[in-house]
């Protein structure tokens, strides 16, 4: 009888040990992950070296936002005069992506003419009569680009030149897709891109104002057209 009891006890120990091992290995399998599946195409774009590509300024824009009085609801605006010096894009190759763009600072537009042509001109250190003077131009110029590991975007290190200061920042570039317009001889590929970043206007660029927060967000939307 004792021998029978010992045999049963031994069998139970073996069963329990096997169950515990299988449970542990099953849990370990659940922990592992391969991350998001990121797919990239083969689209390429070269402005201004490709004569078939043009920058569609009418449907592009540069907007900004910052907390009013440093901590309230957002004060927003845009720049009415902007341009693209160059833009190169290779969807699957980060080394083939680079760009340079600019805005005229004195063409700020918050839908309040008195503010736009008054206190903001003083804050930026410009006048309404300026055009291509260095003090009136804010420039972004890419330095390096990496493929994002979270989505199909691109992480961009770039220089922002503004208010007499040049500082390296990091932003996010998104390829918004391509749509074909027209047909036959008038057919065009229309490309869309979004570039977003933030900067410290007071700390890094010497802006003096109690009306805005230090942190300013920028969103650039760019459209290009390519004849087929």
Task: Walk through the language-model features, giving the residues of each.
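Gram-negative bacterial Sec-dependent N-terminal signal peptides
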Residues: 9-17
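C-terminal motif of bacterial Sec signal peptides marking the signal peptidase cleavage site
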Residues: 19-23
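Bacterial N-terminal signal peptides that target proteins for export
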Residues: 1-10
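Low-complexity, acidic/polar, glycine-enriched regions of mature
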Residues: 25-228
């Amino acid at each position: 009888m004792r021998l029978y009891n010992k045999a049963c006890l031994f069998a139970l120990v073996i069963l329990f040990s096997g169950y515990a091992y299988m449970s542990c290995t099953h849990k370990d399998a659940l922990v592992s992950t391969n991350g998001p599946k990121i797919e990239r195409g083969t689209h390429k774009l070269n402005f201004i070296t490709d004569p078939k590509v043009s920058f569609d300024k009418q449907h592009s824009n540069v907007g900004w936002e910052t907390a009013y009085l440093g901590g309230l609801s957002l004060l927003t605006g845009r720049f009415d005069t902007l341009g693209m010096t160059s833009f190169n894009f290779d969807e699957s190759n980060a080394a083939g992506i680079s760009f340079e763009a600019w805005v005229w600072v004195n063409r700020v537009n918050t839908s309040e003419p008195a503010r736009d042509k008054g206190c903001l001109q003083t804050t930026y250190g410009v006048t309404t009569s300026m055009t291509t003077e260095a003090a009136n131009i804010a420039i972004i110029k890419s330095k390096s680009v990496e493929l994002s590991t979270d989505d199909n975007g691109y992480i961009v290190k770039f220089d922002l030149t503004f208010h007499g200061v040049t500082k390296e920042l990091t932003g996010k570039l998104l390829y918004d897709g391509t749509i074909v317009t027209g047909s036959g001889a008038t057919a065009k590929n229309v490309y869309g891109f979004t570039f977003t970043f933030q900067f410290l206007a007071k700390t890094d660029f010497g802006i003096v104002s109690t009306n805005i927060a230090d942190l300013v967000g920028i969103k650039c939307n760019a459209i290009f057209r390519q004849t087929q």
